Amino acid sequence: VIAGAARTDGPCERSFTVTLPNSMISIAVARSVIRRITTFESDDAQSSFLVALTEVIGNAMDEHVRMDIAEPITLSVRCDSTDVVSVSDLGAGYDMTDESSAPDDPTHQSGRGLALARAFVPAMGVVSSDVGTTVTLPLVGLGIVR
């Protein structure tokens, strides 16, 4: 039984990284990896996390295409006292605190992915710098890495 995604057996203290090509297959690969290594609290928690992950990877791929970046996107999983999944890309990023850069029209074709991801994983973090962007998706309250 998972109680609030807290580890009862102590931290597992391991991590790994998967490089994902800028291809739609990367979304399926990432989702499969997470499903295989994570025990979710419920089917709804799994669905919510996977929707957020899909949006984050899709945004990273869009940014790489827009900026003509050939390097892969990185999916990292850290398993310690709190389990975290991270997606890193080499794009310019998006300032989640700058409301003026978000589209005003909810029917706009882009700009909603990270907001949707945050709706499903409220503790999501975004760090952008001149060398890229990393989005962290904590599993707290959703599941644990096995």
Residue ranges, per PLM feature:
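Conserved beta-strand-loop-beta-strand hairpin that lines the nucleotide-binding pocket
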Residues: 1-17, 61-146
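Conserved ATP-binding N-box helix of the HATPase_c
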Residues: 44-71
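Bergerat-fold GHKL ATPase/HATPase_c domain
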Residues: 1-51
